[in-house]
C-alpha cells in the first residue's frame, strides 16, 4: 500500500511540473523574402509606396523544429500599419510547416501563407487578413479564404495592434486561438477566438517549423511581429527520467521486502 502511495506521489509530482515558457529573441529567427529586423521586431513587409501587383512576401522561422507529438502553446503580438493613403494590405499569419526555414509563400492576399516553399496546402496556422478581406481565423490547409469576419475594418483602420495565443492539445488534436485586436484609429479593442481539429503529427511528422509570414501587393503595410514566446505543456525529458528512476527504486524495494518475509 505504501509503495502504491509513493508511486502516486511521484506521478502527481511529474504532472504538477509547471509549463516552461521560452521568450523568443526575434533576431534569432531565420528570415526569408522581404522580412528584416527593425527596432527589435520582425518586420515581415514594409510600406514601400511602390505598387507590386505580383505580390511580396516575407517570413521568419524558428531554426529548430518543434515536436508535434507534445502539447504546446505559443503567444505573439503584432502591429499592422498603413501609410494612410488607402486601405493597408494584406495581412500576416502564424504558420506551422515542415518545408524548411528559408521559405515563404505567395504574397498579396495569400499573406505568404499559401504555397510555402512551393508545397501547396501544407501550412497550418492562424491567419489575419486586412485590405478588403478583413478576416481572421485558424487554417489547417494552407488556405486563407473562408475565415471569420473581423470585428472591424482592418484595412481601413490602417493602424492595428494585437496579440494571440495559439494552443495545441496533442491528445485531442484540438488547435485553439484566443486574442485581442485593437483599432488604434478609434482606440477600441475586440476579443477574437477560433478552434479547429488537426493532427499535426500525421500532417508533418514528428517535428515542424514554427514562424510567421506576411504579404502585400498593390497596397502595402508595415507588418511586424513585436513579441513571441513558446510554452511547453509537458514535462521535460529529465523529469520523465526521474519518474522512471523513482518507479524502479520503489519496485526494487517492494520486491526485496517480499523476499525477506
Predicted regions and their residues:
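Hydrophobic aliphatic residue packing
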Residues: 11, 60, 234-236, 250
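Ser/Thr-centric signal marking residues that sit
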Residues: 9, 165, 239
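Bacterial N-terminal signal peptides
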Residues: 8-14
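A short, hydrophobic C-terminal helix/tail in secreted or cell-surface proteins
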Residues: 236-255
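Sec/Tat signal peptide C-region and signal peptidase I cleavage site
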Residues: 17-21
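Positively charged n-region of N-terminal signal peptides that target proteins for export
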Residues: 1-4, 236, 255-261
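Polar, low-complexity loop segments and adjacent catalytic/binding residues used for recognizing
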Residues: 22-232
Amino acid at each position: 500500500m505504501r509503495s502504491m502511495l509513493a508511486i502516486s506521489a511521484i506521478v502527481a509530482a511529474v504532472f504538477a511540473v509547471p509549463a516552461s515558457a521560452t521568450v523568443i529573441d526575434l533576431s534569432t529567427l531565420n528570415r526569408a523574402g522581404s522580412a528584416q529586423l527593425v527596432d527589435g521586431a520582425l518586420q515581415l513587409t514594409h510600406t514601400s509606396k511602390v505598387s507590386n501587383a505580383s505580390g511580396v512576401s516575407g517570413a521568419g522561422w524558428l531554426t529548430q523544429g518543434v515536436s508535434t507529438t507534445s502539447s504546446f502553446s505559443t503567444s505573439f503580438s503584432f502591429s499592422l500599419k498603413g501609410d494612410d493613403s488607402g486601405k493597408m494590405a494584406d495581412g500576416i499569419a502564424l504558420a506551422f510547416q515542415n518545408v524548411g526555414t528559408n521559405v515563404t509563400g505567395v504574397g498579396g492576399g495569400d499573406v505568404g501563407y499559401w504555397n510555402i516553399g512551393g508545397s501547396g496546402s501544407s501550412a497550418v496556422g492562424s491567419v489575419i487578413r486586412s485590405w478588403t478581406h478583413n478576416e481572421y481565423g485558424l487554417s489547417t490547409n494552407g488556405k486563407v479564404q473562408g475565415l471569420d469576419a473581423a470585428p472591424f475594418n482592418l484595412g481601413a483602420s490602417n493602424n492595428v495592434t494585437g496579440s494571440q495565443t495559439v494552443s495545441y492539445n496533442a491528445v485531442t488534436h484540438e488547435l485553439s486561438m484566443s486574442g485581442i485586436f485593437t483599432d488604434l484609429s478609434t482606440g477600441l479593442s475586440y476579443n477574437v477566438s477560433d478552434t479547429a481539429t488537426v493532427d499535426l503529427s500525421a500532417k508533418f511528422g514528428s517535428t515542424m517549423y514554427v514562424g510567421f509570414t506576411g504579404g502585400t501587393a498593390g497596397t502595402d503595410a508595415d507588418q511586424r511581429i513585436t513579441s513571441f514566446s513558446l510554452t511547453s505543456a509537458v514535462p521535460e525529458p529529465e523529469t520523465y527520467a526521474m519518474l522512471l528512476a523513482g518507479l524502479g527504486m520503489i519496485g526494487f524495494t517492494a520486491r526485496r521486502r517480499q523476499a525477506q518475509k
